[in-house]
Amino acid sequence: MLRKDSPRGILKIGATGLRARFTLDGKEIGFTNMPYTDMEFETGALKAGRHVLAAAVDNNFDKLSSTFGMGDRMKIFLPYYDFYGFGGFYRGVSLHQVFESTIDRVQVRTLCIKTGKVALRFLFSGKTEGKHAVRFRFNTEEAFRTAEVAHGETLECTVPEFRLWTPEAPNLHTLEVHTENDCVVERFGIRTVSTGGKQILLNGKPVYLKGFNRHESHPEFGAATPDALMLEDLQNLRDLNCNFVRGCHYAQDQRFLDLCDEFGMLVWDESLGWGNSAEQMADPEFQEIVERETRLMVRDSINHPCVIIWAYLNENNSQTEPGFRMGERVVKAVKEEDPTRLVTFACNHTLDDITSKLMDIISYNIYPGWIGSHPVGVEPPDEIPPFQEKTIEYFRKNVSADKPMIVSEMGCCGIYGQHDIAATQWTEEFQAE
């Protein structure tokens, strides 16, 4: 029930799986085929009173979905992916009544960690033409600053009494922005991330990343993870003295990133993909979806200081020309959206990759002693050092002798509760060894 008229409405979808079509009072207002991606749809003018908002959500992979108006085969989430394609809503759904011109958000970028100088990029929606009068202030400032800005325009200013964001001291600041009829509050941290030779630098100082990969998946809740479970995961990481988590293999929930901001947990955020073939990456529709979902991920999470790495398409066929061209396209798109962070992807073609040379960081997935053939008479743990040495040698010789490296995946899987005194594969004993 809407209590008043409004010239516009915006339907905000946190994330769905795998496709969804939305109607308002029988009229279609939006469609998404990008799982785990936050989406927004304009509804047009809204009258006071009752309305029927309907959603058809489908996690079929094949053409059966076209019967229900869901398009052709699912392009970006395929049956062979090694995690389940849950159906339904993963995150929040909300309908907002807004004015003809609204402030969508303000992107905050650190310019100088010594002075607290930041760049504010103002983004409006609806009628965005011309200048917009804004009032803004940082943290608990009493007085507002004023300016007239156009859509996409950037202002530079200094945050008073600023403190840097670091894993040890995750200091956060707020920016409150008002227009004539709208208001947004952005939370951000002042910090920089860069590389210096083989090192990753946070605020100009080397940082050594120690952490785990993490999925949004639970036997009871699926991909709709409650806040308490997110918090428990971060507590466990903290107890293990970790400072880094890789969100795999899709854009992360904003609630989780909020917690990481507060915990001081550094984050690798990547767009959806897993083992994608050269044929897929040569498909123009697939390329368009990958670029769009990656751009949306960056826009959604750009103000989170915890995010230091953007990534895409886990374990794609990076040894092929389509893989290289896909990498070129994604890196270009990410740098257009956000030139301040590092870009990578998790590579499993560790002896023939040609795409990692485009990245800021070389990242690789290896499973010596678990996946693949095993030398006779060699214990699985003993396979790790020579495999590591061979991988590093290839990348240093063929990609870069002077880029940071991340072991993005390594180890082996175990099935909870499966035991064997002989420590056979998939047992907890084999995994622990």
Can you say where each PLM-predicted feature lies in the sequence?
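Substrate-binding/catalytic cleft of secreted carbohydrate-active enzymes
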Residues: 234-237, 244-433
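Extended acidic/polar, glycine-enriched regions
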Residues: 46-50, 121-196
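A short, polar/charged loop-to-alpha-helix boundary motif
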Residues: 35-46, 196, 218-225, 275
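Surface beta-strand/loop "capping" patches
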Residues: 97-128
